């Protein structure tokens, strides 16, 4: 083979399908502490050695014509008549609860770090991520990306005047 990939972490997924329907009306995906570590085999002339860490990946979707679900308050799983109680949050993995609010469409936070080196060939990089022949690229970066729907007070009077606005946010630290 040319490369090897190691994957670890937690993933939880759920969907809600109305009785009589065949397609899901609501779906959610959450990932946490996911680590992806690829490495190219020696002698290939191409090197890929690093770790992509996904601290969190949240995705909340609804079918056309429906608002996204508030997963933290949508269920009465223990049948006690209280919706969104302590025992009413979906937690299929036991480690990662599905509890996104309806305002969140997606969120991603993570980092990438090179863990190879070219010091054996006289180089000075100790955090090589990618190599191709004599070219080496190294370093690390952290990132976040999110999209949510919120109400916005655009004039500072304490009242929302832009309702249901989409807010996209991105951060990158190198």
Question: What function would you assign to each model-found segment?
Answer:
Residues 1-174:
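N-terminal low-complexity, acidic/Ser/Thr/Gly/Pro-rich segments
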């Amino acid at each position: 083979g040319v490369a090897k990939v190691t994957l670890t972490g937690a993933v939880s997924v759920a969907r809600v399908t109305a009785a009589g329907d065949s397609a899901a009306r609501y779906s959610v995906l959450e990932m946490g502490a996911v680590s992806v570590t690829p490495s190219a085999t020696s002698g290939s002339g191409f090197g890929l050695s690093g770790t992509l860490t996904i601290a969190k990946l949240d995705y909340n979707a609804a079918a056309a014509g429906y608002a996204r679900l508030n997963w933290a308050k949508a269920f009465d799983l223990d049948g006690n008549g209280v919706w969104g109680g302590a025992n009413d949050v979906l937690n299929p993995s036991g480690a990662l609860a599905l509890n996104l609010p309806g305002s969140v469409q997606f969120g991603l936070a993570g980092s990438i770090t090179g863990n190879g080196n070219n010091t054996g060939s006289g180089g000075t990089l100790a955090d090589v991520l990618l190599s191709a022949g004599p070219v080496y690229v190294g370093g690390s970066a952290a990132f976040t990306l999110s999209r949510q729907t919120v109400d916005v007070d655009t004039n500072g009077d304490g009242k929302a005047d832009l309702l249901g606005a989409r807010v996209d946010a991105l951060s990158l630290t190198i």
